[in-house]
């Protein structure tokens, strides 16, 4: 996957592609379109690629070069992706556990939809508040 720099702007094609791979393969596993462990692994690899890019890859380098405000925003983004998005694999494990090596996740007493709703609330509301706070700080 290429670094994709164009002038002073970063081409986000690779990150969008990784996001699509993460979502589509996760859906395929949840929908029972093949082995859930295989689809979950492919989805997880795309997730870890995005985490890597934000914390150590081209996204981090560009943010650092853009100044402290952008680097600070990138760090907040990194934490949301690392911690906030980690809620979704838990829902995936709960929803696809039957007959898999991780079948114990089906018995932890949580409903997959509730886990996803909590993840959505944490990520959407929390991320919006962080972006708002960073914009106020920059103004």
Where on the chain are the PLM-derived regions?
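Alpha-helical transmembrane segments of polytopic membrane proteins
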Residues: 39-47, 116-120
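Alpha-helical transmembrane segments in multipass membrane proteins, preferentially the mid-helix core
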Residues: 25, 46-68, 91-95
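Mid-membrane cores of alpha-helical transmembrane segments in multi-pass membrane proteins
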Residues: 13-22, 43-46
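A cytosolic-side transmembrane-helix exit/cap motif
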Residues: 32-37, 55-67, 131-135
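Membrane-interface helix caps and helix-loop-helix hairpins in membrane proteins
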Residues: 27-38, 48
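Hydrophobic alpha-helical transmembrane segments and adjacent interfacial helices
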Residues: 20-30, 89
């Amino acid at each position: 996957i290429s670094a994709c720099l164009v002038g002073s702007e970063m081409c986000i094609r690779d990150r969008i592609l990784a996001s699509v791979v993460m979502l589509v393969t996760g859906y395929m596993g949840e929908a029972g379109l093949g082995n859930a462990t295989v689809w979950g692994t492919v989805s997880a690899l795309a997730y870890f690629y995005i985490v890597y890019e934000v914390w150590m890859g081209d996204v981090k380098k560009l943010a650092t070069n853009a100044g402290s405000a952008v680097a600070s925003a990138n760090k907040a983004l990194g934490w949301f992706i690392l911690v906030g998005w980690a809620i979704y694999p838990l829902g995936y494990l709960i929803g696809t556990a039957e007959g898999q090596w991780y079948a114990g996740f089906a018995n932890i007493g949580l409903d997959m939809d509730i886990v996803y709703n909590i993840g959505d609330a944490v990520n959407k509301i929390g991320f919006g508040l962080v972006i708002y706070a960073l914009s106020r700080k920059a103004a």
